[in-house]
Amino acid sequence: MSSKTASTNNIAQARRTVQQLRLEASIERIKVSKASADLMSYCEEHARSDPLLIGIPTSENPFKDKKTCIIL
């Protein structure tokens, strides 16, 4: 009886594997050289609005302390 259960589990696992492989095979792929060129182009186009590159104006920074420490 346990061999029948093991066989059923193996078949179910094999079906899941085949389904996953079919899904992965259907994904459209592009060359790394094209993907990296597209990524660099996107970064260059959006660099002017990137706060990590241009910084956040002090007046708009919500994390800046409003007051200085009086104890020091």
UniProtKB/Swiss-Prot annotation:
One of its GO terms (cellular component) is synapse. A lipid is attached at C69 (S-geranylgeranyl cysteine). Coiled coil: none annotated. It is found in: Cell membrane. The modification Phosphoserine is found at S26, S49. InterPro entries: G-protein_gamma-like_dom, GGL_sf, Gprotein-gamma. SMART domains: G_gamma, GGL. One of its GO terms (biological process) is signal transduction. Belongs to the G protein gamma family. This is Guanine nucleotide-binding protein G(I)/G(S)/G(O) subunit gamma-12.
